[in-house]
Amino acid sequence: MLFGDKIKELREEQGLLQRQLAAFLEIDTPMFSKIERGDRRAKREQVSKLAEDLHQDEKEMLTLWLADKFIDAVEDEQERDLCNDAIIVAQEKIKSL
């Protein structure tokens, strides 16, 4: 959970409470806690808002968020080589888009 760990780290470094960031996102604190723990995925627009509020590069935050989505898609696959091969194929397809 790259994104959740990053927002928790930044929040703690900046001395912010979960409820403060939850209010900024207009969600309740338990929902924010789930996002931070990786139990729930933030929406793309929430990632952008968090990047702004935490004074972080939006592209970096979106990259972590999207990487988590990829990891979630393959985490139950037992054959890691198959996962790596699928990522390479997807990467090549993305380049051609």
Functional labels for PLM-detected ranges:
Residues 7, 21-22, 32-35, 61:
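Conserved hydrophobic/aromatic packing and binding residues within compact polymer-binding modules
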Residues 5, 30-33, 45-48:
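Positions in alpha-helical segments
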Residues 62-97:
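Short, charged recognition helix plus adjacent turn
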Residues 5-24, 49, 77, 82-84:
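Short basic helix-loop element that most often maps to the first helix and adjoining turn
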Residues 1, 12-13, 41:
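Short amphipathic helical patch at the helix-1/turn junction of helix-turn-helix
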Residues 26-41:
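Recognition helix of helix-turn-helix/homeodomain-like DNA-binding domains
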Residues 26, 43-62:
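DNA major-groove recognition helix of helix-turn-helix/homeodomain DNA-binding modules
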